[in-house]
A protein has these predicted regions:
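Glycine-rich beta-alpha loop elements in corrinoid/cobalamin-binding modules
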Residues: 1-169, 181
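Flexible glycine/acidic-rich beta-alpha junction loops that bind and position SAM and/or redox cofactors
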Residues: 2-3, 30-41, 62-70, 241, ...
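Conserved, mostly hydrophobic/aromatic
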Residues: 25, 191, 225, 229, ...
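Terminal amphipathic helices with adjacent charged low-complexity linkers/tails
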Residues: 49-69, 73, 128-157, 166, ...
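Flexible, glycine-rich loop/tail regions that form catalytic "lids" or insertion modules at the edges
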Residues: 52-59, 205, 220, 359, ...
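N-terminal [4Fe-4S]-dependent radical SAM core
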Residues: 145-218
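N-terminal pre-triad scaffold of radical SAM enzymes
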Residues: 205-233, 258, 267
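Conserved SAM/AdoMet-binding glycine-rich loop
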Residues: 256-403, 407-411
């Protein structure tokens, strides 16, 4: 995830590509099975790693760029004022340097980032061209260029139309080839067919590992995610195109767990992946998929070209739970509930047979302004899903609950948003125990927002209004306190915040109040009636 210059939260700085820092010869990104096989075969044939600089899904460091490739500048700015969006960052425009220049001051509102070949070629081979990103030195000193580089990087995530990216680090060039093509079902089955031990490494010497206890009987049925949540980097690692195993391969692994895992009790802890309900969901058109530049197939709305039929997943659940020796199949992966709403039969199947009292889902927030920075659906989708969840739970004669997850201090979220979220939680009688505060992770779009205070989902401009970003520790703790409004340890902080916001109407001991009065003040009021001391 650090194949180009990336912001590092722990050092609060932009770090160089890990290729530079590690002095590695080559970096394979993603799951890399195909790239690893190709690399191994080529090395076995006697080739040097330096000769494999065009390997898809790999990044290398070059001292000199190939002369027969065309460079496309993603950041040509006529005046350091604003940067326009890049709907197609490698589209070739045949025009003179002055063509299309603004004629009035009002037209100077945006400065065109028109990619132009720099090697004096009027025509060029699109397959032998690369995009020049702002250098490490530039993105380190210019947050707007960092956001711009992040924007272009994410636009180049579709393996069927992505370009090679190049970023200079002093005198060296980091060359990032396009992402690997997704594995076919047969290849996925092959990857999962090896005789994995399903046990911790012997170096742990029998020590208990809580994380292992959670996943030792779980089965990965797919990889990839087309959700595009900005705080997550799964798409940049596993890809946006879903890669699914065959039903036979999955059933075979369940049977192997049943027969070989010591102490197996009959429960499969999860059938899932990055998301619970994206198994075999792909674009209906290969042609459209090959040219698509969307960052998400489900935001701001579910794409009309996306197959949303959950029946393969429903069928898999039914077969898995009827296997001899299998008492229960749980679904522990996060559910994309807006997608599930497209197939109520799936929701019914899930709620009736595969929820063990609680189902984890992740609305992340209630406020549209913040949700738009996360690329998450409206909270209305949650409300719709909850209605169906409660209905099917009642029909099954089960008392079951949703456990929603929320994030505090996400870029774009201010105290007003967190207050509204807190009131939403109180209205719905949620008292979250485990809550999370946003932390920037490499390559995530939200990390670009955090560092640059700009929104790379839209036009990146120097003079555009910055988005609110919470970096101060006290402010981050305050936002987290809104999520745990019911914890008395947070009441003093929340009372002070509500007073600063002019919302003292939410302080009191009635049901509609968010936090109670200060207990000290209340106890004093029993003895002091507010009359001045005559002495």
């Amino acid at each position: 995830l650090r194949r180009i210059a990336q912001y590092d939260y722990w050092s609060d700085s932009v770090r160089r590509s890990i290729l530079i820092d590690s002095n590695a010869d080559i970096l394979l990104f993603g799951n890399s099975e195909r790239a690893l096989v190709e690399l191994s075969h080529q090395i076995a044939k006697g080739k040097k790693i330096s000769e494999l600089w065009q390997l898809r899904g790999a990044a290398v460091v070059l001292k000199k760029l190939p002369a027969d490739w065309t460079e496309i500048d993603s950041t040509r700015i006529d005046w350091p004022s604003k940067i326009d969006k890049l709907p197609n960052p490698y589209e070739y425009k045949e025009q003179s340097a002055t063509e299309g220049a603004a004629e009035t001051d009002s037209q100077l509102e945006t400065i065109r980032v028109i990619p132009m070949p720099l090697h004096r070629k009027e025509k060029f081979d699109a397959n032998r061209s690369y995009i020049r990103l702002p250098s490490y030195e530039k993105v380190t000193n210019d947050p707007a260029l960092y956001a711009h580089a992040s924007r272009v990087l994410h636009q180049e995530a579709n393996p069927y139309n992505a370009k090679t990216l190049v970023q200079k680090h002093q005198t060296l060039e980091v060359w990032v080839n396009p992402p690997p093509f997704p594995l076919e079902t047969e290849e996925m089955d092959w990857v999962f067919s090896f005789n994995y031990k399903r046990q911790p490494h012997p170096s742990y010497q029998g020590a208990r590992i809580p994380a292992y206890d959670m996943i030792k009987t779980s089965v990965n049925i797919m990889r990839g995610c087309f959700g595009g949540c900005t705080f997550c980097s799964i798409t940049e690692h596993e890809g946006r195109i879903i890669q699914s195993r065959s039903e036979e391969s999955i059933i075979s692994e369940i049977e192997k767990i049943r027969d070989t895992v010591p102490g197996f009790t009959g429960t499969i802890s999860d059938l899932g992946g990055p998301t619970a309900n994206m198994y075999k969901l792909n674009c209906k058109s290969r042609k459209i998929q090959a040219s698509c530049k969307r960052l998400s197939c489900v935001y701001p709305n579910i794409c009309q070209h996306l197959n949303t039929d959950h029946s393969p997943t429903t069928q898999l659940y039914r077969k898995a739970r009827t296997l001899p020796g299998i008492k229960r199949v749980a679904i522990a992966s996060g559910l994309r509930y807006d997608l599930a709403l497209k197939d109520t039969e799936y929701i019914k199947e899930l709620v009736t047979h595969h929820v063990g009292g609680y189902l984890k889902i992740a609305p992340e927030h209630s406020e549209k302004k913040t949700l738009s920075k996360m690329m998450k659906p409206s909270i209305n989708s949650y409300d719709e899903f909850k209605i169906l969840f409660d209905r099917f739970s009642k029909s099954a004669g089960k008392e079951q609950y949703l456990i929603p997850y929320f994030i505090a201090a996400h870029p774009g979220s201010d105290d007003e948003d967190m207050l509204n979220l807190s009131l939403w939680l109180k209205e719905h009688n949620f008292k979250p125990d485990q809550v999370q505060t946003f932390y920037p992770s490499p390559m995530a779009l939200a990390t670009a927002m955090y560092y640059s205070e700009r929104n790379p989902l839209e036009r990146v401009r120097y003079k555009t209004e910055k988005i609110p970003v919470i970096k101060n520790l006290d402010e981050r703790q305050r936002q987290k306190a809104f999520l745990r409004y019911h914890d008395e340890k947070n009441w003093p902080m929340l009372r002070n915040t509500l007073k600063e916001m002019g919302r003292t109407d939410l302080i009191g001991n009635k049901d509609h109040h968010l936090v109670p009065y200060d207990s000290v003040i209340k106890s004093k009021s029993r003895f002091y009636k507010g009359k001045p001391n005559k002495r």
